[in-house]
Amino acid sequence: MSDFKPDFALRLHLAADALAAAAGGSTPDRRASRNVKVSGDSLGGYTGFMPLDVPAVQDALRAEGLDGWLLYDFHGSNPIAARLANTLGEGQMTTRRWFYLIPASGEPRALVHAIERHNLDRLPGRKTVYAGREQLEAGLAELMGGLRQVAMEYSPNCEIPYISRVDAGTLELVRGRGVDVRSSGDLVQRFEACWNAEALASHRKAAEALYRIKDRAFDAIGRRARDKVSTREYDIQQLMAGWFREAGLVSDSDPVVAAQENAANPHYMPIAERSRNIGDEELVLLDLWGKLKQPGAVYADITWVCFTGLRVPDEMARAFSAVRAARDRAVELVRQATRERRELRGWQVDRAAREVLQHAGYGDHILHRTGHSLGTEVHGNGVHMDDFESHDDRRLLPGSGFTVEPGLYFETFGVRSEVNVFLGDHEAEVTGPLQAEIIPLGSSQVRT
């Protein structure tokens, strides 16, 4: 039981009521105020804002032999927990630590600070309110009572950085109560990273818009090249940014437009002060990602490559051919596993793609993983196609959305092909066209 004193809680509410009355606001029902005084308050009932299906989470916890899933956040340090608990809404301040425990059986429980005691009111369960650090420690001890193993956003040896969100000190605090902490990676994949029907529909619309913008950009690059109009990477990028606005897309960044040696840097970004001209007979890589401007929308993310001349040099064509084969191998592996209802993990997809590139003699030119999760952020928290930068052992589950984007990088150019894959119950779908070859723009007949 928390030792947060009832009379102190009541004084807080009385002060808040007085301020509200002085400002002309209404005074809440005093009985409702008293109901929030110590542990044991209702959290207000599930109103549908929380993406978690608590009974389904509890089934998963029991299947994995875990006693609970302990969500924790401080000041936005754990965006996974914040999103699951829906504390990211406008007008909400999250400057204090909160915990929310979903036990394998029984009622969820929360531990919240007195000045932000309503932040978890949308969630099912009961809460304890604390103010000082002694009350926090007592409340946490009560919250963890009887538990042996809980899942948190933690990854052993930081193997999956996207999951490793809880700081080492908080892990010590939990483990100091005799509780073993396990990774919540598989739980996050299932309950935070999988798309519902609305998310999939938003992704499709975003993808369709990105492909149209890509076509317009290729047309602009080709036309300017043929007409000998001086054009910088930044010029094309800003045209594309305007088309994003026209299409109702938002993004965390303007698109990548990278010519020749700049395409050898996978995360090159042209800016007004640093941008090269796009010359004749040069390769140009476009990487563009965006989502609809609506709550819950998920990203689409594609990469295509063109050439401003008539004939693509053999060196570039061979490299792209290997990238295309690696991409297609990864996609086919996912499709086959889905059809056969066979378990597949992120690292296996990456390894399959990289083996194609290595067998083609390009192993030394691989700089990154094969793909990443897609979500409301372009790099989502779900399973990544990665056995290169990390070892992502999480399973690909129905509802997963992710990229497949093998690339090769040399001193004078780089090539990459990026597509998006959605995993349905019975089929894996690539949500857009696949590039077959580097597109030569020197002809008036541009093939996309």
Predicted regions and their residues:
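Active-site neighborhoods and metal-handling regions in enzymes and metal-associated proteins
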Residues: 4-18, 22-448
